[in-house]
Every structure is written in C-alpha cells, then in structure tokens.
Curated annotation (Swiss-Prot):
Oxidosqualene cyclase involved in the biosynthesis of limonoids triterpene natural products such as azadirachtin, an antifeedant widely used as bioinsecticide, and possessing many medicinal applications including anti-tumoral, anti-malarial, anti-rheumatic, antibacterial, anti-inflammatory, anti-pyretic and diuretic effects. Converts 2,3-oxidosqualene (2,3-epoxysqualene) into tirucalladienol, generating rings and asymmetric centers in a single transformation. The active site is at D486. This is Tirucalladienol synthase OSC1. One of its GO terms (cellular component) is lipid droplet. The gene is OSC1. NCBIfam families: squalene_cyclas.
Length: 760
C-alpha cells in the first residue's frame, strides 16, 4: 500500500541536504504489508471509479493521500449536509453549514508540518524523461521498483485516448509528443511491442506511424530521442554551449532568457555539445524499427529537422528562426566541431556549462528548478562522472517529484505546497471561525514561517545570472529555493492576517524583518509597465520570443509580467502599508499606482483579463478584481470594474454557475464548456470576483445563484467534486491543481457569508 510521508529525509546521508529539516517535503513509499482489507478495498474502489469515468473526468480526485489522512485523523463529518431547493432562499445558517463542512474537511487533509499536499501535474511529458534518464544510466530497476512500474503503467493506460494516443496534457487530443513519450515509457519499462492493457502498445504505435512516424515529433522530443539513440543529433536544431561564453548583456546570452528556458537549455546544450548518445541496446535497435516509417540508416536527418506533426503545432517557427537554425547548422557547427575550435572553444564552453549546472544543482539541493530540467541535469552529471557525488545527490531527490493518485503514478512540476497552503489559509481565515479551526491555522502559520527563503542563492549568484531570493517564498518548499512573486505575495498576506489574531491560537507573529525582506523582493520585480514578473525581473526584448523553438508552447523565451502576480502584490502591499506604514513607504505607493494602471491596461475588449496561470479569463478576472478592489477601486469610480462585471454576468450559465474550457488558454478567447456546463472552481472564482466588484450591494441575485450551485454540489463529507483541469502555463499546457476544488469554493462561501446580506 502506498503512503505519503511528510517532512522526511535521511539526515545522515551524505547525498541529501535540507535547509529546514525537510519541512514541506512530500514523498511516497510503498509498503507491501500495509493496509487493512478495508483500507485496500477503499483504494481499489477509488481506482476503479476513476477508470470507469476516465474519458469524462480526466484529472484525478487525488484520493489516495486523502483517504490516508482522513483515516489517520479519524475524520467524520459531523455537520449535516444542506441543499437549496428551487425557489428557496439561502439563509445565513445554510451558508454557514456549507462553509463549516468545507472548512472542517479541508482542515482534515492538512499535513503534519502544516502544508496542504496535492497533485500538481497533468502534462504527459513530465514522467517519461525520468524513465529515459534512468534507463540510460542503468538505474531504472533500482529507482522504479515493481510497485512504481505498476503505477506508471496504470497512469498511462488511464490517460490513453480511444484513438491510441496521448495528448501533451491529460485533457488534450492525441499528439506525437505525448504518444511517442508514453510509448517509449511502456517499452522501456518492459512491455513488449504488442503488450499492455487494451493493446496499449500496438494502438500507440499505430497512431505514431499513421501520423507520419517519429520524425514528426516536435524539436524538444527530437533532443531526447537523440540522447536515447533513436534519432541522430544531425536531425535536431543546434544548441551550441558557446552562447554561455558571450557577454551576459548580449541578446542571445542565456542570461536574457526566462529562467525555465535558460535551465532547460543549460543541460541540453551540454549534451548536444558532447553529442552524447546512450547505450545502443537491442531494445533501442528494435525501437528504431518500430517508430520510424523508413529504415533508420536511410533517413535524411538534415531534412527532418524542421518537421512537426500538425497535431503538435501550436507555435509555428517564424522565418527568422529558421534562418538562425540553418545558419548554426550549416555554418557555425561545422567550424566548432573541427580542430582547432573543437579543442579551444567547444571544450571550454562545455566546462563553463557544466560549472553552471553544478551551481544550479547545489542552489536547489539537487531538486533543480523543475521536473523538465531535473532528468537533464541528472544525466549531464552522470555523463561527466557516472560515479560522481553530483549524480548520487540527484538520485536522492527523484522522490520529491513522484506523486501517486488513484489514476496511477505521475511526476509533479516540483510541488505546489506553499502556493496551495497560502491560498488555503486565506480561505480558512475568511471563514472567521478561528476557535473551531485554530490548530489548522496554527500549523499552517508555522509552515509558512519555516518555508520562507532565508538566504540568497549560494556564492556569487549574480555571476550565475540569478536574482536574489532572500525573503521570498517558493511555489513548493524552502529546499527548492526558487523565489516566486505571487507565492510571496499570498504568503505575506497570510502572515499579516495572522499578526492580527491571538497568538495563543495561531502562534507568534512572523518577525517583521522577514516581512520587510518579502516586500523588498516583490518591489524588485516591478517592470517599467507596472506589472511584475514571477521569478526574475522582466526586461529582455520581447522580440526574442521569435526564437522560441518549442512548437507546442508560447511566450517562454523571456520573462513576462502577469496580471495575477501583480494583483496579488497589490493586495499584499495595501495590507502591509496599513500595518507597517514606514517601511519603503514612497516606493510602495509608487508601486501601487503603476501596478493598478498596469492591470487596467491589460483588460481585454470583452472586460475580462487573460489568466496566464489558471483557466483562464474567469481566473484572471477574479485576481484582477481582487487587486483593483484592494487598491480602492469600485464599480462607481472604475470603468474597468464595470466592464468586468458585465463580462462575468454575461458568462453566467443557466444553472447559476460558471464554467470555462481550457481551450480559452491557447485560443486567447473566452470559450465556455460544452453545453455551458459549470464547475465549482469557476463558479467560486466568479463569485469572488463579483463580491470584489460590489455586486452584493447592487443586485446579489447572480451571487445567490452561484452559491446555490456550490452548496448543492458539495459532497457528503464536505469535499467538492473534481471536474475540469484548472491550471495552465505557457498558453497551451494545462496543470492539475487538485486542491483548487476545495480552496476556491470554501473561500467563496466564506466571503459570501461575510459580505452578502442573508436572512437568518
């Protein structure tokens, strides 16, 4: 039986380190002897229910850890379930009952160290590179046990489409990228070419070959296939490591890139520069025959470089990019790979690149910035020294990425511990029932204090192209180390709330100096347009986006500013200014003026705001309205708010709720769900937005209708149903935030009960 372990790690191991006793760490362990017959039956029932409905509801309900926590805490919902009939008014007591039921359930799924665990996954290309790397290095059997393999295969079977393929994420239609990666994972884990549940391998292979074969995989996939020996490096776009040797202010230096882009390029250019290829095993030779539509030795690699399946093509390469690739391919690379430049330039560039890889690994305790970078950095360390300490330290941190759900084993982005906790705590605080949920609040407060980043990246971080991190909060845990603006703003809001509550209930307030450090970090990220970025300050030319090599994502070359992050910062600063009016007073006031103007400028023609990190216009609009409301804007004095209210009211469905398709994100146009279905998360976001906009004072009817849907959707134990996927990044790839279905409905019910007049 699988069990989630919290804040655990071998403190005596020379291959793993921590900055705060592993607070926030969440790892899964399999114990074949654990679990009663009843517990095992519960888990199996959850798996079977997901399987039966897998084509209707793609994201898992994250029940494996929830069942465990609810058992361990002996949770029983004691507040009777409530429903609102047609024509019936929602009373204060009804709203209170629904809110308390949600709050008690949510408190019960809190971890012992104070954070809220959850799945944060969804893309089908997160897991396979871990399998690829471990296969190449010979560690696949030791890291992924038979229990792991069963869960990986369960995940792939559950998310295989009826046409035999897989999308780039669990809700997307079949793609070459997702299908090739998933097929290779099954085969490397030991399935034969015609094995797998419901002929999984044969159906996947047919999809690949019917769509042109593996040469049509996007450029990112071509890189990993070259590493595996299923492709030739001559069939990929050049990634010269020499760019690291340019002056850092030069437009093509990686320092100008968005941090995730930079840190993918970093190990990839090392592997490319060495033309590294893993062992050509009999299985690799067989896979060459299975995946290509012509004999491997007959393929014209030069011609396949620019090929990409139509199913995967979201961002076509501009002409200027094709010219750059061809220049590097035909002119630059032939020079850099021949004597004397291969010895005096290429070797020096590779050493410089490896030095930066080691720096980033050490700064993140070998977690790295994310799951895409992790296996690449791990492999680069193995290529440098298969018996080296760096590679062994990487192996110890694989567990930090693994997540087990009723749909199987997947790989996380890197965990959303702090983000979910900061939002969840605000939802609980809004309930205004401190006496009932004091222990959950105190543990959450303690977690946030321990999760704040206390130091900057190690050594001379500016020479390694890093922004300062002291005072920030990460998306995941402190060991991860990567500062995030909105996680910092939302965590700061929590700490400020807690400072106004009785310390005997919620714990001592956070050290003001630590709060000042958080403010300093947020201030450092404001761009000249008034918005703030996520990880590092924006500023590189947006024209560099023309060089985006990833055909299925957009806006990933340079850092951008974001409405949601800016709105969170406004809310945090308005609250901070009231409690600490003297710290950087003038700078905060100037920040707020520019930030509000930025949000107003970013509003779309229909009155909404595009959500960059959530689906989509309902998500962005909720955050934007929260920021404007905090800054003192109202329906009467702000045209942007009036236009936003009009958008929200027009988007309301006949059932009283709201529901938006993930397709809004890539299309950049509001797309309702088929049949104008509603979801509890979108409904909650819209309710929060309308409350921010003062709709309760004008006409609360739309809010009442939305809350009725929330109350009637609540499950018997206080949970809410899992529905559509709710997160996104880079326009076209979705992320599953499993806690959103609890956080936002709870928050909406709490704000409704506090701010909307209700009959007793």
């Amino acid at each position: 039986m699988w069990k989630l372990k919290i804040a655990e790690g071998d403190k005596n191991s020379p291959y793993i380190s921590t900055t705060n006793n592993f607070v926030g760490r969440q790892i899964w362990e399999f114990d074949p002897n654990a679990g009663t017959a009843e517990e095992l039956a519960e888990v199996e029932e959850a798996r079977q229910n997901f399987y039966k409905n897998r084509h209707q509801v793609k994201p898992a309900s994250d029940l494996i850890f929830r069942l465990q926590f609810l058992r361990e805490k002996n949770f029983k919902q004691t507040i009777p379930q409530v429903k609102v009939e047609d024509g019936e008014e929602i009373t204060y007591d009804t709203a209170t009952a629904a809110m308390k039921r949600a709050a008690h359930y949510f408190s019960a799924i809190q971890a012992s160290d104070g954070h809220w665990p959850a799945e944060n996954s969804g893309p089908m290309y997160f897991l396979p590179p871990f399998v690829f790397c471990l296969y190449i290095t010979g560690h696949l059997d030791t890291v992924f046990t038979a229990a792991h393999r069963r869960e990986v295969l369960r995940y792939l079977y559950n998310h295989q489409h009826e046409d035999g393929g897989w999308g780039i994420h669990i809700e997307a239609p079949s793609s070459m990228f997702g299908t090739v990666y998933s097929y290779l994972t099954m085969r490397l884990l030991g399935l034969g070419p015609n094995d797998g549940e419901n002929n999984a391998c044969a159906r996947a292979r047919k999809w690949i070959r019917d769509n042109g074969g593996v040469t049509y995989i996007p450029s990112w996939g071509k890189n990993w296939l070259s590493i595996l020996g299923l492709f030739e490096w001559a069939g990929t776009h050049p990634m010269p490591p020499e760019f690291w040797m340019l002056p850092s202010h030069f437009p093509l230096h990686p320092a100008q890139m968005w941090c995730f882009c930079r840190l993918v390029y970093m190990p990839l250019c090392y592997l490319y520069g060495k033309r590294f290829v893993g062992p050509i095993t009999p299985l690799i030779k067989q896979l060459r025959e299975e995946l290509h539509t012509e004999p491997y030795d007959k393929i014209n690699w030069r011609k396949v470089r620019h090929q990409c399946a139509k199913t995967d093509l979201y961002y076509p390469h501009p002409f200027v990019q094709e010219v750059l690739w061809d220049t590097l391919y035909f002119a630059t690379e032939p020079l850099l790979t021949r004597w004397p430049l291969n010895k005096y330039v290429r070797e020096k560039a590779l050493k410089q690149t490896m030095k930066i890889i080691h720096y980033e690994d050490q700064s993140s305790r070998y977690i790295t910035i994310g799951c895409v970078e992790k296996p690449l950095c791990m492999l680069a360390c193995w290529v440098e020294d298969p018996e080296g300490v760096a590679f062994k330290k990487h192996l110890e941190r694989i567990a930090d990425f693994i997540w087990i759900g009723e749909d199987g084993m997947k790989v996380q982005t890197f965990g959303s511990q702090t983000w979910d906790t900061a939002l969840g705590l605000q939802a609980l605080l809004a309930c205004n029932i401190v006496d009932e949920i004091g222990p959950a609040l105190a543990k959450g407060h303690d977690y946030l204090k321990k999760a704040q980043v206390r130091d900057n990246p190690v050594g001379d971080y500016t020479s390694n192209f890093r922004h300062f991190s002291k005072g920030a909060w990460t998306f995941s845990d402190q060991d991860h180390g990567w500062q995030v603006s909105d996680c910092t703003a939302e965590s700061l809001k929590c700490c400020l709330h807690f400072s106004m509550l009785p310390p005997e209930i919620v714990g001592e307030k956070h050290d003001p100096e630590r709060l000042y450090e958080a403010v300093n970090f947020i201030l450092s990220l404001q761009d000249k347009n008034g918005g703030i970025a996520v990880w590092e300050k924006a500023g590189a030319s947006l024209m560099l986006e023309w060089l985006n090599p990833v055909e299925f994502l957009e806006d990933l070359i340079v850092e951008h500013t974001y409405v949601e992050c800016t709105a969170s910062a406004i809310e945090a600063f308005v609250m901070f200014k009231k409690l600490y009016p003297h710290h950087r007073k003038k700078e905060i006031e100037n920040f707020l003026v520019k930030a509000v103007q930025y949000i107003e400028n970013e509003q779309t023609a229909d009155g909404s705001w595009y959500g960059n990190w959530g689906v989509c216009f309902l998500y962005g609009t909720c955050f934007a309205l929260g920021g404007l409301h905090a800054a003192g804007k109202t329906y009467n004095n702000c045209l942007a708010i009036r236009r936003a209210v009009e958008f929200l009211l027009q988007a309301q469905s006949d059932d009283g709720g709201w529901g938006e398709s993930y397709k809004s994100c890539p299309s950049k146009i509001y797309v309702p769900l088929d049949g104008k279905r509603s979801t509890v998360v979108h409904t909650a976001l819209a309710i929060l937005g309308l409350i921010h906009a003062g709709q309760a004072e004008r006409d609360p009817t739309p809010i009442h209708r939305g809350v009725k849907l929330l109350i009637n959707s609540q499950l018997e134990n206080g949970d809410f149903p899992q529905q559509e996927i709710m997160g996104v990044f880079m326009r076209n790839c979705m992320l599953h935030y499993a806690q959103y279905r609890n956080i936002f409905p709870l928050w909406a019910l709490a704000e409704y009960r506090r701010k909307v007049p209700l009959p007793n």
